[in-house]
């Protein structure tokens, strides 16, 4: 393996390490031989603050998982270049990058320079990357670590910049750019690496119950999902019953009622990466010390949040099956020690402007290649060829209802994704969006349990242009 040096890249892909400054220990990695820069309890608690400049963000149109490492690096560099060219006073003395082998036009979208050039306090913890304006203390963003996919910093060509990809309701998936004082970018990216490692160690000691398929089945005699029934002429709808009304506009974005959606993070070329699940909230202190290599996390959200208890049963439409066991399983997951599961992430509602945070589910889904729009059951089934094929469509009988259609053991299955209040959920967990739900099960290779059978999401059926 190559030694980690200023001009070389060291990375972690899917938990596999590169660079012999890092070693493998059990199911995760040891810290670098020189040690981390900060005490573990500080990173796990209030977090480590850095004074940097927020330079804006550039929309990323494709999942980082679909790109190879070199392309991810090129995307990061190009995003930094675009922002530096657009923001007056940016440290633009970067050496011109070599052109990427593939065009980035289809990967990078529009820029958002709303807070460009603003001095901020970046607080790095095992919970999140918190971006707060230094003068007015306004929180620009709070990107939860479990939504981080890739981070990059201290590259020779972009030595004073840190870039990471995150997903939020305002910018969707975007590459956020931070300008650091001289020599600080390496420290920032190293601290992010430390936070990921600590978070992963917490994860190993106290894994969320949801990731164990056996536990998901234990004591379960119904379905974790509501299945779509056949489209019959006498189909019963919610407004067939006194006091029952369909959701206004199809669905209500419940994420914004309980909090904002999580974010996605990206990694740096010269440093280390680690694919780690994370989640929780942090405070802010003042201090700045130095750091080390980069790390890579999972772009999509690894762990969904639990559904609040005592919410009335929403799936009471007689056309849906296996709904009798919904209520009793909605209690938040608890860790083995009796404490609340640290991966039961609590949505944040103060990280982004509420007025701008409203993004319709339809607009979000149109960005996903596996979303087909309005489509009947039979049309959807004709598109499924092999086991593991899946797509998401809007129901032709219930506007605003989205259905996951997949093929398992040669049999098509149709699963409802959204309850009448617009919440995307399973029997005992809710997700920030349909995209969150799909990527969670794909990234973690977890089957969806329904009526005692499993549905695995392996090959997305992309819509025809």
From Swiss-Prot:
GO terms for biological process: cell surface receptor protein tyrosine kinase signaling pathway; intracellular signal transduction. Interacts with grb2. Residues 44-227 form the PID domain. One of its GO terms (molecular function) is receptor tyrosine kinase binding. The keyword Cytoplasm applies. It holds the Pfam family SH2. InterPro entries: CEP152/SHC-Transforming, PH-like_dom_sf, PID_Shc-like, PTB/PI_dom, SH2, SH2_dom_sf, SHC_SH2. Its main location: cytoplasm. The keyword Disulfide bond does not apply. Residues 228-369 are annotated as: CH1. Residues 370-461 form the SH2 domain. It comes from Xenopus laevis. It is found in: Cytoplasm. SMART domains: PTB (SM00462), SH2 (SM00252). Keywords: Cytoplasm, Growth regulation, SH2 domain. GO terms for cellular component: cytoplasm; plasma membrane. Implicated in ras-dependent oocyte maturation induced by insulin/IGF1. This is SHC-transforming protein 1. PROSITE patterns: PID (PS01179), SH2 (PS50001). Residues 281-315 are annotated as: Disordered.
